[in-house]
């Protein structure tokens, strides 16, 4: 029984080259030190005397800087090697966190948050561009899944350690987070001093030089990705409120429900992505979005810890289908010369939702109630299912006439 399971894991990871593994390792180092942002609101309110709304503005300013940073990072990747963009983003972010920990005045912190978002979020499209260049088209989705595995392992470690450090002194959060950013940048420069391994098979689109701004299916997918992210980011805002208010769960139990998401991704995402590799990825992204919405739409119909876990399992399966596959779809849609811009715009669709999702979600939660919010997420899931099926049909017609 154990042998087939081990064989499935070997198959899921097989074929990924050295560059993909090293990029994912750098991500793991970086995410293992992620401590500042998860605790920033608490730090600003508790230590610096910010009002809750002012702390929210600071987070929003980071997101606003991140929108520009995502596009800039992708744009730069079409002009210089992505590894330089990644290393530069990490190094500047590391210095930025060290400086932020020394600031106390409101205006200086607001300015610092914009700049941190600008330099920090360029890391995402640059990493995606580097992964796409390193992996052949048929392995790109698995390369993105491996990077997501590194993110989830790191994020399960960093914030938990950060909580203990914060009890001693918040200063340690800025030191450790900044230090791991600098360490990851140094690791990349050393590991890739001779350049990255590039796949021999690159161009996968019939229009390799086409601008993303004239790519109809991609622009529609941008809107759908934004809707997907609006639903997704409820996990970091109103999901916890619902488990507290409607389910009566305490912080520890809420943390366990959240942990189900990470555990399932770490254990099964690579295998799942490998198993569905022969199916239409655009249609699967739509199915993933539907399951995301369905898992959230289940919430008003239960009130127990076990039911919350079941709902988390459903939307986690949706996440495992939609997130790595969507990155692969965008990477394969682009040509070599403009993949950075494509990945930058793809990242912007999520960065934009990061700004609006908590505002919209909490407003609906307070004004119309949690049931309306979660059933609304279910409706969005249906829109995503239908929308991505329509885009898939559009792309198939496009290929036939190319």
Tell me the role of every PLM-derived stretch.
Residues 13-63, 219-224, 229-257:
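Helix-loop boundary and gating motifs at the non-cytosolic
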Residues 113-153:
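Cytoplasmic helix-loop-helix junction between adjacent transmembrane helices
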Residues 101-112, 300-311:
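Helix-loop junctions at membrane interfaces in 12-TM secondary transporters
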Residues 1-17, 193-223:
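Juxtamembrane intracellular "pre-TM" segments in multi-pass secondary transporters
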Residues 84-98, 283-297:
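Structural signature of the two symmetry-related core transmembrane helices
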Residues 35, 63-67, 71, 155-156, ...:
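Residue-level signature of mid-helix packing/kink "hotspots" within the transmembrane helices
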Residues 69-81, 268-281:
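Helix-to-loop junctions at the C-terminal end of transmembrane segments
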Residues 174-189, 374-389:
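Symmetry-related core transmembrane helices of the 12-TM Major Facilitator Superfamily/SLC fold
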């Amino acid at each position: 029984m154990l042998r087939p399971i081990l064989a499935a894991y070997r198959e899921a990871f097989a074929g990924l080259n050295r560059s993909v593994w090293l990029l994912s390792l750098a991500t793991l180092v970086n995410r293992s030190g992620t401590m500042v942002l998860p605790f920033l609101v608490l730090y600003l309110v508790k230590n610096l005397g910010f009002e809750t709304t002012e702390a929210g503005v600071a987070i929003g300013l980071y997101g606003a800087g991140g929108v520009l940073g995502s596009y800039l990072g992708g744009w730069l990747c079409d002009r210089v090697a992505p590894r330089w963009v990644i290393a530069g983003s990490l190094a500047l972010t590391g210095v930025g966190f060290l400086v932020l920990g020394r600031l106390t005045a409101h205006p200086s912190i607001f300015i610092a948050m914009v700049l941190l978002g600008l330099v920090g979020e360029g890391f995402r499209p640059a990493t995606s561009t580097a992964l796409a260049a390193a992996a052949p088209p048929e392995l790109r989705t698995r390369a993105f899944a491996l990077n997501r595995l590194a993110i989830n392992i790191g994020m399960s470690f960093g914030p938990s350690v950060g909580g203990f450090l914060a009890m001693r002194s918040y200063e340690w959060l800025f030191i450790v987070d900044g230090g791991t950013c600098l360490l990851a940048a140094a690791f990349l420069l050393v590991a890739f001093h001779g350049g990255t391994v590039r796949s021999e098979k690159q161009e996968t689109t019939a229009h390799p030089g086409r601008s993303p701004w004239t790519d109809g299916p991609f622009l529609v997918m941008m809107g759908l990705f934004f809707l997907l992210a609006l639903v997704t980011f409820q996990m970091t805002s109103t999901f916890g409120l619902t488990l507290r208010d409607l389910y009566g769960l305490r912080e520890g139990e809420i943390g366990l429900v959240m942990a189900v998401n990470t555990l399932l991704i770490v254990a099964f995402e690579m295998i799942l992505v490998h198993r569905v590799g022969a199916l239409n990825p655009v249609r699967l992204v739509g199915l993933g979005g539907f399951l995301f919405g369905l898992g959230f739409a289940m919430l008003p119909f239960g009130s127990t810890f076990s039911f919350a876990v079941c709902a988390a399992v459903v939307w986690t399966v949706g996440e495992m289908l939609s997130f790595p596959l969507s990155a692969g779809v965008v990477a394969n849609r682009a040509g070599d010369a403009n993949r950075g811009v494509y990945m930058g715009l793809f990242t912007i669709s999520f960065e934009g939702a990061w700004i609006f999702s908590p505002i919209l979600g909490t407003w609906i939660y307070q004004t119309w109630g949690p049931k309306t919010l979660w059933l609304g997420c279910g409706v969005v899931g249906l829109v995503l299912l239908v929308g991505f099926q329509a885009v898939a049909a559009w792309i198939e017609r496009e290929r036939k006439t190319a």
